[in-house]
Amino acid sequence: IQRIWNMFIHLNFTSPLAWDMCVITTYLVINGLDIIWLRRGDERKVKMLSYVALPVAILVHSVTAWIFGLEIAKEGWYSAIMAPIFVASACDSGLALLMVVLAAVRKAGVFDCGRELFANLARLLATFIAVDAFFIGCELLTTAYPGTEGASHVLGIMTSGATAPFFWFEILGGLLIPFVLLASAKRRECTGVVVAASALVMCGVFCKRVWLLFTSFTVTNVYGAPGISSGPTAARG
C-alpha cells in the first residue's frame, strides 16, 4: 500500500512507467463508466465517452510500447516504430479474439451477428494483419541494413538462435498463413477458416511478445559505466 501511495505523491513524469500508470488508470475509469451507463441505457453518455475511449485505448498500447522503445541501451527495443507495432498487434489480436467469441456465441445460439458482418470483420482482420506485417518488416529492415555488431547479434538470436522458433511462427503462422486464409472472399464466409486464422493470429502475437522481450534480454547492455571504455578495471584504476 505504501508503495502505491508513493507512486502518487512522488510521481516521476520522466518515466514511461508513470505514463503507463496514468493511462491504464484512466482506461479503467472509462471502462467502469461505460459499463454503468450501458446498464442504465444512457446512449448519449456512452456515445460521448466513446470519443475519449478510442484515443485512450491507443495510448494504452503506445505507452506500453514506449516502456521498451525508449530503452536506449537495448538494441532490439530502442525504436521509433515500437508503438505503431504494438497498436497494430492489438488491433489484429483483439479483432481475432472477437471473431472467435462471435463464432462461439453463434454456435451456442446466444447471438448471431449475421454472415455478412462476420465476413466484413474477417476482411478487416486481414487488413490489420497486413499493416502489422508491414510495420514488422520496416523494423527488421531498419535493424538489418546498417549491419552493426549489436543489431546483427540481435537478429542472429531472433532468426536462428534461442528465440527463432517464436519469431518464425509469428511470421509464418501468425501473419502469412492467416492473411492467405482471409484474403479470399470465399474463405472469409467459412466460419471454421476464420476461427482457425484468428487463433493463429492470437498465437502469433503471443510469440511476438516472447521474441521481442527475451531476444533483447540475452544481449548485454554496456560493459562498464558510460564513458569508461575498458570497464570496471579502468574504473578501479
Model-flagged regions — what are they?
Residues 7, 152-159, 219-236:
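Short, membrane-exposed interhelical loops at transmembrane-helix boundaries
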Residues 193-203:
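Central hydrophobic cores of alpha-helical transmembrane segments
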Residues 67, 207-221:
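Hydrophobic alpha-helical transmembrane segments of integral membrane proteins
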Residues 17, 21-191, 204-207:
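Long, contiguous internal "core" modules enriched in hydrophobic/ aromatic residues
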Residues 1-19, 23:
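Membrane helical hairpin/interfacial module
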Residues 4-5, 144, 213-214:
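Hydrophobic positions within alpha-helical membrane elements
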Residues 2, 180, 210-211:
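Alpha-helical hydrophobic packing sites
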